[in-house]
């Protein structure tokens, strides 16, 4: 569970921003959105495989030297 301590003389907006940042870092919002509806195991595997392929393409693209622009 994510908790934050409100510092003295700290505006509520700043504390709320800190709370949202900490929630996002833990990945709680992403997990909640994933659990809102059932995803079949085959669909989940397909989505994860596509994400892995995209990550690999991105990694290869970054490791290549930049193209020369004449």
Swiss-Prot record:
GO cellular component: ribonucleoprotein complex; ribosome
UniProt entry keywords in alphabetical sequence: Ribonucleoprotein, Ribosomal protein
Lineage: superkingdom: Bacteria
Span list, region Disordered: 38-70
GO molecular function: structural constituent of ribosome
Keyword check for Ribonucleoprotein: yes
Signal sequence range: none
Basic residues: compositionally biased ranges: 45-70
GO biological process per UniProt: translation
NCBIfam families referenced in this protein's UniProt entry, alphabetically: S21p
Family named by the database record: Belongs to the bacterial ribosomal protein bS21 family.
This protein's name: Small ribosomal subunit protein bS21C
Gene responsible for this protein: rpsU3
């Amino acid at each position: 569970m994510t908790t934050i301590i409100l510092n003295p003389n700290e505006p509520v907006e700043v504390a709320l921003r800190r709370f949202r940042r900490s929630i996002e870092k833990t990945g709680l919002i992403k997990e909640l959105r994933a659990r809102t509806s059932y995803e079949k195991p085959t669909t989940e595997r397909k989505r994860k495989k596509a994400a892995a392929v995209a990550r690999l393409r991105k990694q290869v693209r970054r490791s290549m030297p930049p193209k020369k622009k004449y």
